Amino acid sequence: MSEWDAYADQWDDDELVIHYSQQAYQSLTQAINCDGLTILDFGCGTGRLTELLHPQAKRIVAVDSSAKMIGVLAAKNLPKTEPLAIDLNSSNSQPMRNTFDLIVASSVCAFLPDYQASLAMFRQLLKPQGYFVQWDWLKQAGESTPGFTAEEIQAAFDQCLFKTISLQQAFTMQQGEDEVPVIMGIAQKRNQTGGFL
């Protein structure tokens, strides 16, 4: 059972979740034409971003480790969408290698036990020249809150053989009295020698 199961029933009604997914979608579609793409929505939750993307996509595989979150998404019966309750890793993801034009991870990567290992897996799942896009809380150097500095994301992209296309603050979220910035990283798969596959 995932720790996120407890949030599933109320997740779609959370104003922060709704606003975050809308802002993520808007920033994504301003940067990448999603028409006709095969997309992996990694850590999809109840599928707020999947719902926004599915009219444009050729196909979406929406994965989350929370079976209850996936249950909420599955009940929406979105066309061209395959919801999977799975803790995706380098072993069980092998059948998906070279499958996706685009992988999105919205407010997920900062909570992964091994961010770089997940990036390496994403690279294997992408088609040649495929894109990976993440949104996470932007933190400053030395902060211990969940999130990343731009330098941390850049270093991970480099280490995992991605070319950084864009790395910038995409939007902010109101949390109490604070405006919390969200960083968006866009990277493209490249081959072992630095060129594009």
Label each PLM-derived region with a short phrase:
Residues 1-34, 72, 140:
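Conserved class I S-adenosyl-L-methionine
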Residues 46-91:
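Class I SAM-dependent methyltransferase SAM/SAH-binding core
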Residues 93-103:
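A short acidic, Gly/Pro-enriched loop at the edge of an enzyme's catalytic core
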Residues 102-114:
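A short SAM/SAH-binding and catalytic strip from SAM-dependent methyltransferases
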Residues 117-128:
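A short glycine-rich, Lys/Arg-flanked "PGG" loop and its adjoining helix->strand segment in the class I
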Residues 130-137:
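Conserved beta-strand signature within the Rossmann-like core of class I S-adenosyl-L-methionine
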Residues 146-161:
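Short alpha-helix
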Residues 174-197:
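Core SAM-dependent methyltransferase catalytic element
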